[in-house]
Amino acid sequence: MKTLLLTFLVVTIVCLDLGYTLICHQLHGLQTCEPAQKFCQKRTTMFSPNHPVLLMGCTYNCPTERYSVCCSTDKCNK
């Protein structure tokens, strides 16, 4: 009986880990990423002179812009 319970516990842990999704900060709160989105980003962009805009959240690729941060662990883009 103990062996059966231990086996069930191990299978449950393995199955739960397969459904892991990344969590990233947004401007207001947290965002659960889609399975294909493997990175969190934080970047500052200039839409017009003297008006910076901060963008945060999940992304498929790391941005290559000068003022950007890209990471791949939960809540790493604060």
UniProtKB/Swiss-Prot annotation:
S-S bridge residues: 24-40, 33-58, 62-70, 71-76
Supply the InterPro entries for this chain.
Snake_3FTx, Snake_toxin-like_sf, Toxin_cobra-type
TM stretches of this protein: none
Query: Where expressed (tissue)?
Result: Expressed by the venom gland.
Pfam families, per database record: Toxin_cobra-type
Q: Indicate yes or no for the key word Kinase.
A: no
One Gene Ontology MF term:
ion channel regulator activity
Q: Which residues constitute the signal peptide according to the record?
A: 1-21
Site (Key residue for inhibition of muscle alpha-1-beta-1-delta-epsilon (CHRNA1-CHRNB1-CHRND-CHRNE) and important for inhibition of neuronal alpha-3-beta-2/CHRNA3-CHRNB2 nAChR): residue numbering on this chain: 46
Identify its protein family.
Belongs to the three-finger toxin family. Short-chain subfamily.
**Function text:** This three-finger toxin binds and inhibits the nicotinic acetylcholine receptor (nAChR).
The identity of this protein, by name, is Short neurotoxin SNTX6
The organism of origin for this protein: Ophiophagus hannah (King cobra)
Species lineage: Eukaryota, Metazoa, Chordata, Craniata, Vertebrata
